[in-house]
Structure formats: structure tokens, C-alpha cells
Amino acid sequence: MADQLVRATAAQGRIRAVGVLSTRLTEEARGRHKLSYVATAALGRTMAAGLLIASNFKQTEARVNLRLQGDGPLGGILVDAGADGTVRGYVKNPQVELPPSPKGKLDVGRAVGANGFLYVVKDLGYGYPFSGTTELVSGEIGDDVTHYLVTSEQVASALMLGVFVGADGVDAAGGLLLQVMPSADGQEDEELAATLERRLASVEGFTPLVRSGKRIPQILEELLGDMGLEIFPEVQLVRFHCHCSPQRVLGALKMMGEAELLDMIEKDGGAEATCHFCNQVYQVKASELETLVEQLRSEREVSSQE
């Protein structure tokens, strides 16, 4: 099944619901970064969370960055997700592997670490970003993002994330986000929020449902079918996509300055650059570096004549 995002409402618009299936894009991230089992689960959960948050943005070019910086051996996670359905991300130490948790599951919480912060930066397409920071709750990512949504954005939220990694790769990945919209007077419906939390808590997890063959509309129907569920007919496809390019690499190298470029030409006969987000390697020839040097000299000459 293609990776996709499904939106819905319930309780006469008081509940906003969105679900994302991100199995393929999580597997692509695993392959690109050569991730361990626990690193795959951690990055996969964070990418799903990013897509769920970005799904509420109005502008197509709007994006959100999630950075988890805990005290665990993964060393940090950074994800960039957009309202256009694209997402990318990486972990600092992708090869880290840990024994299973006491429950027999991948120990994402210990890999990330419970002591640290979640940094969120939103670019809503208006020319200036919005940022928020909250302390990590458990390092399990779902708890941490929920804590951010409730405390920083002040929206009652229930979030479920999951990644199942088998011997041959990612079998299932994605998540659900249920939110109670404030009333006209700004008051929260605490009873409704508690109901959503109980219903999500009663589910054994997102990936078991997906692996049993259920699709997102079916899962939403089970959770909210008795609450006036309305599923939007438009299904948005989501994918792993990075915005890096040879041109951007050259632009970054140019910013290093003439002296550094000349040193690369003399000592290395070129340059090699790797994109952190997608692990794409770019080889830059000496002739391309020489062109950058010429551009810098020309720009400096023009500037001196002004």
C-alpha cells in the first residue's frame, strides 16, 4: 500500500483526526542511512510525527522541523516535514543498537534518552518562523510530541506512533493524531479529550493494526465511528524527499571562501560533500571549485568598484 495521509473530523468538528501510513518512506530512510533496528524505529516515529503536525498547515510550502536532543546514545534526531507530504531526516549515530526493552520491544526511549529537549520550528510560509521548546518526557517520541502539543500549542492531543522492523526491513510504520479543537470561547472539552486518550490507550498499537491488514479509514472508524466520523475523500500521498542538489552543494562550498576552496583544489583535487538528511554523496571536481573561486574574485572586484 502506498504511503498516505488521511484526514477526518468527528463530534461535529470538535475532533480533528489524521492518520499517516509511512512504511515505505521509513524503509527508504533505513536504507539510505544504514540504520540499526532501534534507530529505524526512532527516526520512523519522528518522521510520522512531523507529517502529522504538518498536515494541519494551510500553505503548501509550509514546513516543520522536529529536533529531539536527549542524553541517549542516538545523539539526537532531526526531521523536516512539509504540508506537501514530503519528509526527510537523520539520527546522529545511526548504528546504535540496544537490547529490547523489558516489554520485549525496541528500546527507543533509552536510545533517545529521557533527559533533554524537543525543539520545534515551524515555517508557515509567511516569511518568519515560529519556534517552541519543551522538555522530553520519556524519549519514546510519541509522549514527547504529545507533551509539546499540549503545553506549547495548548491543544488537547492524543498521539500514537509505531514502527515495526522485521528481518527484511520495515513492515509497518505510521501513526494517528487526535486533537480536540477549542470551543468558540477558547475552552477545552476535557471530557472529550479524556475519551480520546482512553480509546487510543485501549489499542495495542498502530503497527499491529496495520500488519493485520487494516487501513487508516478502518482504524479511524473503530476509534471514532460512534462520534459522527467524517473522513475526507482526498488522500494525500507522502514520501521521503530531500531538497539537496549539486547546485546547493556548490552554493555551500562557495560560502567557505576563496582560501578554503584553493586549499581543497591543491590538497584534494576537488571536494566531497554528504547531505546529512538523505546521505547523498556529491563529488565536486577541481574545475568546479576553480569556477567558484573565479566567481568570488569577480564579485569582490565589482564590490570594490561600487
Curated annotation (Swiss-Prot):
Disulfide bonds join 242-244, 275-278. It is found in: Cytoplasm. GO terms for molecular function: protein folding chaperone; unfolded protein binding. The keyword Secreted does not apply. PANTHER family: 33 KDA CHAPERONIN (PTHR30111:SF1). GO terms for biological process: protein refolding. Coiled coil: none annotated. It comes from Gloeobacter violaceus (strain ATCC 29082 / PCC 7421). GO terms for cellular component: cytoplasm. Belongs to the HSP33 family. Its main location: cytoplasm. The keyword Chaperone applies. InterPro entries: Heat_shock_Hsp33, Heat_shock_Hsp33_C, Heat_shock_Hsp33_N. Pfam families: HSP33. Under oxidizing conditions two disulfide bonds are formed involving the reactive cysteines. Under reducing conditions zinc is bound to the reactive cysteines and the protein is inactive. It comes from the Bacteria. Keywords: Chaperone, Cytoplasm, Disulfide bond, Redox-active center, Zinc. Redox regulated molecular chaperone. Protects both thermally unfolding and oxidatively damaged proteins from irreversible aggregation. Plays an important role in the bacterial defense system toward oxidative stress. NCBIfam families: PRK00114.1. This is 33 kDa chaperonin.
